[in-house]
């Protein structure tokens, strides 16, 4: 179990919907500090969060997840002045706009990766940090394809690939930063929006999604925090239909484990075995 008591949490997302509900639950876990970085100011939401736990310090910054990494560094230098350190980084910014592929990829994938790359040095044990946990909030259509929301699905597949790659022991054993992901199923705040399909053939299905059964943002937020508390490095969870399920991960490339051993080995014999296995 990961104990959130006394932790310094940084949440990068819009303070509404899933992010707001997740933050409400976090405020009941006796965290010491909560930094919220979002694209627009939402003072009523901040006030609601503060009313849950007056002793938890809440800090807010307007933040564009698609900004260049150099600009991100300036923001997080300011964040660290107030936060001292970050125990938990939650990436929750998301966009589903099939008519704007660049914005969808930049928000869901590129921006998230730049955020992680910017924050990791502050958390890295070998760089003076205390280790910690990175949580990538993503979607179930990052695990299985969506013929309707193709660009959105592709960006979320990227999040899963990034999460699993960064969770490799090659990094974790050195920097002490665990990485996990929570894949949310259809949730009210998402399906309530007007959504466009990638191709017009799928628009009927996109429209029908607005009437489909879905979980509430409150239940999804609760399960995200539960997944964090149960987390181990590299885990992928599904938060859907009010439940929480641990994903069984598979290696589809039969040489994957041998390739990693080869990359980490200085032994000529091991390298020769890898080359022989490919023939």
UniProtKB/Swiss-Prot annotation:
Record-listed NAD(+) binding positions: 11-34
Residues annotated as binding substrate: 139
InterPro entries: ADH-rel (IPR002427), NAD(P)-bd_dom_sf (IPR036291), Sc_DH/Rdtase_CS (IPR020904), SDR_fam (IPR002347)
GO molecular function: oxidoreductase activity
This protein's GO CC annotations: cytoplasm
Annotated gene: Adhr
Protein name: Alcohol dehydrogenase-related 31 kDa protein
Keyword flag NAD: no
Species this protein is from: Drosophila madeirensis (Fruit fly)
Family: Belongs to the short-chain dehydrogenases/reductases (SDR) family.
Keyword hit for Glycoprotein: no
Cross-referenced CDD domains: ADH_SDR_c_like
Active-site residue list: 152
PANTHER family documented for this protein: 15-HYDROXYPROSTAGLANDIN DEHYDROGENASE [NAD(+)], ALCOHOL DEHYDROGENASE-RELATED
Keywords from the named record: Oxidoreductase
């Amino acid at each position: 179990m990961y104990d959130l008591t006394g932790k310094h949490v940084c949440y990068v997302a819009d303070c509404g919907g899933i992010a707001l509900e997740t933050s409400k639950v976090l405020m009941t876990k006796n965290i010491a500090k909560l930094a919220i970085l979002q694209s627009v100011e939402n003072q009523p939401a901040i006030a609601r969060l503060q009313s849950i736990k007056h002793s938890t310090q809440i800090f807010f910054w307007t933040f564009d997840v698609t900004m260049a990494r150099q600009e991100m560094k300036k923001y997080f230098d300011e964040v660290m002045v107030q936060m001292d350190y970050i125990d938990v980084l939650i990436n929750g910014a998301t966009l589903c706009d099939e008519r704007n592929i660049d914005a969808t990829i930049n928000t869901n994938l590129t921006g998230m990766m730049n955020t992680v790359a910017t924050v990791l040095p502050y958390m890295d044990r070998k760089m003076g940090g205390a280790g910690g946990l990175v949580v990538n909030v993503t979607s179930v259509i990052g695990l299985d394809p969506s013929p309707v929301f193709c660009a959105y699905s592709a960006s979320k597949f990227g999040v899963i690939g990034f999460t699993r790659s960064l969770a490799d022991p090659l990094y974790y054993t050195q920097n002490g930063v665990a990485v996990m992901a929570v894949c949310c199923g259809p949730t009210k705040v998402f399906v309530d929006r007007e959504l466009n399909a990638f191709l017009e053939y799928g628009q009927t299905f996109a429209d029908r999604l607005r009437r489909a059964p879905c979980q509430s943002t409150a239940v999804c937020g609760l399960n995200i925090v539960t997944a964090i508390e149960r987390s181990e490095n590299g885990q992928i969870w599904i938060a859907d239909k009010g439940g929480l399920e641990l994903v069984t991960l598979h290696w589809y490339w039969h040489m994957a484990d041998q390739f990693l051993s080869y990359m980490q080995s200085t032994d000529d014999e091991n390298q020769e075995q890898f080359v022989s296995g490919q023939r």
